[in-house]
Regions:
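Hydrophobic anchor at the beta1->P-loop junction of P-loop NTPases
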Residues: 5
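Conserved substrate/cofactor phosphate-moiety recognition/catalytic segment
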Residues: 18-66
């Protein structure tokens, strides 16, 4: 089984994914951002591009690699939890379809008001001794606005404590 844990940048996907993985025997986390971080370091010409798009999610190679990686992870884990901030419904749908040939896919989307997401981002930045970045500020707004649409997964209220969110997910998925 795959659990795609979509949600805004800074909404708590990583925290919820970690708690969920600990709560489900045989579960593991697969983080597509790691693939994006690697691709971001490569020069555009290595990716066959004249210039790099601003978002690595726009790279077709990223979308292919994350599906391959998640399927490989599934060989070693009964449940693969995938935390990722998808804002393009076509990319999310393509990813879910690629995984669906391997195992059942559950799409969940952590949702919260923009002010709650930005408060979390500010708190995180303060703990790290820095200011919230322009990227974090802009990306949080893009995500919150996009995730109001119904095609990003079953909405999960992320204004609650992480343990409550995990319990809700387990109940919804009967885990």
């Amino acid at each position: 089984m795959f659990v795609i844990l979509n949600g805004s940048f800074g909404i708590g996907k990583t925290t919820v994914a970690s708690l969920l993985a600990r709560a489900i025997p045989g579960a593991a986390i697969y983080d597509p951002e790691q693939v994006g971080f690697v691709l971001r370091r490569l020069p555009a010409w290595m990716l066959g591009l004249a210039r790099r798009p601003p978002d690595y999610q726009d790279l077709a190679i990223w979308r292919r690699l994350i599906a391959q990686g998640a399927r490989r992870k599934h060989r070693h884990a009964s449940v693969v939890i995938v935390p990722m901030a998808f804002t393009n419904p076509d990319y999310l749908d393509g990813f879910a379809q690629a995984l669906g040939a391997t195992a059942p896919v559950h799409l969940l989307c952590l949702v919260a008001p923009l002010d709650a997401v930005r408060a979390r981002l500010t708190e995180r930045a303060n703990k790290e001794g820095r200011e919230i970045t322009e990227f974090e500020f802009r990306r949080s707004q893009e995500c919150v606005e996009a995730h109001r649409a119904p095609n990003f997964g079953i909405p999960i209220d992320a204004t609650r404590e992480p343990a409550e969110i995990v319990a809700d997910i387990q109940e919804k998925l009967r885990l």
